[in-house]
Amino acid sequence: MKGLFIRIVLAICLSLWAIDMVFPWQQIVRSKQNYHTTIQERQKLIVGTINNPVSYFIGTNGETGLEYELSKAFANYLNVDLEMFPLNSADALFQALAQGKIDIAAASLFYQQDRSEKFKLGPAYHAASWQLTYRKGERRPITLENLSGKLVIPANSALNNILLAKKEKYPSLTWETSELSQEELLFQVAEGKIDYTIATSTEVSVNQQIKPQIAIAFNVTDEFTVHWYLSDKGSSELQAALLDFMNSAIENGLIARIEEKYFNHLNQFDYVDTRSYLNAIETVLPKYAPLFEKYKGDLDWRLLAAISYQESHWNPEATSPTGVRGMMMLTKATADRMNITNRLDPEQSIKAGSEYLHLLLKQMPDTILKEDRIWFALAAYNMGLGHLLDVRRLTKQLGGNPDNWLEVKKNLPLLAQKRYFTHLKYGYARGYEAFQYVENIRRYMNSIMNYYRLQQNQQDRQDRYENENNDVISTQTQQEQR
């Protein structure tokens, strides 16, 4: 319901935004050859963003993130290449935009009155609120009035103006600013280094998957709409093109699919499960990661690892009452089909599980979008291909799109309801388990990706420190030799 509400709000925002600008630019919207001249001449769209697990980061398979996927779709719409230009803060983004270094600033940026007066505003495409966070286990504050410790927010953040307005109601409210990023401040809360910080609900949900000690005290604000920002000079054509694109992206379900991919699986945060899983990533996964890498085939090895954790918690001797066994919890029939002799052997189990999943992927209809095929295949891996075919037929009967995972997954629980399963070819199935199965795997994969991203960032910082230190030592040595 929340996703539907947000899409309704976004549609209304789009309509109001369109009324404000459509009359001067209606001819531009109708004519693609009038799109932003500079972009067309250089054949490249340059989008500024912030490197974080929500907007943009480099994964094993290259660039990814919500803003990257939406920017890539817009670049394709304009029929130009895309260059992502990552920066460290919103201030740096707006400075680059003012200087003409980027065409668009896209980093889950909230609507701000002062910035909307200096830059052109794109249509709303998402919504989120500001939330006060504290360390789990500490006393939970009720309002901004009774904070018993230090509140720290990023320097030059939009939060500063929000808190200044709140201070009129809560005169005792104080806060400090820091040059650390929002993600780094959330980590400091989790580690007990600071008492509180405020972050967007999206950032909190994502970072709870890798720092489960982050707890939400309360919403500081209602939901704000999220926008792209454009330069105030010479961007009217680009703004009109963006309106056209965003309207299409809402109508064809692109925004809903991207939102579902990055956010929906985060809704069911489980503190105990996340702590156990992160501990397993640190202590158990390194032993089996080479095998997941070896047998990944066309998959991301982290997806294969997430499937195995969902199946067995990376326990090679796992056995269920139904007879499935091993790292990938294979049935005897599947093991025989994949020609393995010992389901309790980790390598054989991972190899067979991967091969079986690839086999299921090949059986998915070509009409299913590439990015959705794996989720359909995973549902089939869990409950059987026949039941997946049933839920696709049922989705079509109910007026939905059987090739759209977002529409199909909501019907999975219906496979356990008598009014539906009695009319299905393969009958009853615990579809609600398949639904949760896929959601868990997506959440586990997200945690693995972010864990390794943070490890790489830490290593990069250490390398930079050592290089800078070596440069200083080298300079001092040269001076001494003189």
Swiss-Prot record:
It is found in: Cell outer membrane. GO terms for molecular function: peptidoglycan lytic transglycosylase activity. Residues 19-266 are annotated as: Non-LT domain. Keywords: Cell outer membrane, Cell wall biogenesis/degradation, Lyase, Membrane, Signal. Residues 1-18 form the signal peptide. It comes from the Bacteria. It is an enzyme of class 4 (lyase). GO terms for biological process: cell wall macromolecule catabolic process; cell wall organization; peptidoglycan catabolic process. Its EC number is 4.2.2.n1. Residues 267-482 are annotated as: LT domain. Pfam families: SBP_bac_3, SLT. One of its GO terms (cellular component) is cell outer membrane. The active site is at residue 311. The keyword Secreted does not apply. It catalyses: Exolytic cleavage of the (1->4)-beta-glycosidic linkage between N-acetylmuramic acid (MurNAc) and N-acetylglucosamine (GlcNAc) residues in peptidoglycan, from either the reducing or the non-reducing ends of the peptidoglycan chains, with concomitant formation of a 1,6-anhydrobond in the MurNAc residue. Gene3D superfamilies: 1.10.530.10, Periplasmic binding protein-like II. It is a peripheral membrane protein. Murein-degrading enzyme that degrades murein glycan strands and insoluble, high-molecular weight murein sacculi, with the concomitant formation of a 1,6-anhydromuramoyl product. Lytic transglycosylases (LTs) play an integral role in the metabolism of the peptidoglycan (PG) sacculus. Their lytic action creates space within the PG sacculus to allow for its expansion as well as for the insertion of various structures such as secretion systems and flagella. The N-terminal domain does not have lytic activity and probably modulates enzymatic activity. The C-terminal domain is the catalytic active domain. In the N-terminal section; belongs to the bacterial solute-binding protein 3 family. This is Membrane-bound lytic murein transglycosylase F. It comes from Histophilus somni (strain 129Pt). The lineage of its organism: Bacteria, Pseudomonadati, Pseudomonadota, Gammaproteobacteria, Pasteurellales.
